[in-house]
Amino acid sequence: MSNAEIPIIDIAALTGSDQAAPQGLDQIAEKMHTACTGTGFFYVANHGISKDLVAEVFEANRRFHASPLEDKMRVKRNAWHRGYTPLASSTLKSSARFDSARLPNLLESISIRNELSPDDPVYKKVPLQGPNEWPDVPGFRATVERYVAAVTALGVKLLEPV
């Protein structure tokens, strides 16, 4: 599938963006339904997340991944699957046809999820709810938290037409 085949849905009507002619909620809902039942996913235009914030989170991640392995291992993935996963340290069983995965993933990542306070009523009801592992990279946590807040707000907005 090429990029040209992935639907682009303009959500300016949801975000208040004036960069494009706004579509009504019904039109957005129809396009989302068509995309989700067709290709299974879509690009979002006029989402309202600033290019500066996107650049900042990419830069924060670049700085983390440029850190020495010893530093990254201090925030290795914990029991709640949050934190650093070193390159080739995991395998993914992608099909029931195989007894086990044969090759390690060529993946290096840091997993950060929404963090709830232990006294939040949802805390014990949500699987894998626990603390994030935050690296000691200046500005990393603040930048990632701002980005997570922005994409969470976007996710809530995307539910409006549904």
Feature annotation, model-predicted:
Residues 1-161:
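Peripheral, non-catalytic segments flanking oxidoreductase cores
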